[in-house]
Amino acid sequence: MILLLFLFSLALGAPSESPSDGSKVKLQLDDHRVKLLRGSCPMFWYSFNGRCYKYVATHMSWADAELYCVSQRANLVSIYNEEEEEFVKSLIKNFDHAQRYTWIGLSDIHKEGRWMWSDGCAVNFTHWNVGEPNNGLGGKTEQCVHSIGDSKKWNDQKCSLNLPSVCATRINCP
C-alpha cells in the first residue's frame, strides 16, 4: 500500500519529458534561454531563488491541488515579483507547451475581495489579465486564480474547475 501511494505521488508530478542527465532542462521562452535546474530540490522539483517548484500535470480542483502541495510540504505557488512570474511561466511551458490554465496559490476564499496566497503571505505583486479579477462578471463565484496560457496573466475562476497546478516550497513571507 505504501509503495502504491509512493508511486502515485511520483506520477502526479511526473514530467512529460525528462532530461538525459536528470539534473536540468533547457527551454526557450520568447527570446530568453532559461534553464530549469534541480539544484538541491527533490526529483521532479526545480530550484529558483532558494525555493523548489513542481509542475503537477494531474487535473484537480484548487482545493485538491493545495492539499496535494501540502502533502509535499509545500503550497500552491505564491508569486512575489516579475522574475518569479517569468520562472513559473517557464516551468509551465516546459511541461505543457500549450500553456493551458494552471492553478496558482492566490484566492479570496476567506473574504471576498481580499486576495491572499495559500501560504498565508500578503499579496504585494499581481499579474492580472485585463478586466480581472471580475468574479464571473458580477457574481461571487470566482475565488481562485489560474494563469492564462496565451496572455500569461492571471484570471479568477471557480475553484471547482480541474486544472494542473504548480507547487512551491514555503518561505518566510517577504
Predicted feature locations:
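Extracellular, disulfide-bonded carbohydrate-recognition/adhesion ectodomains
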Residues: 1-174
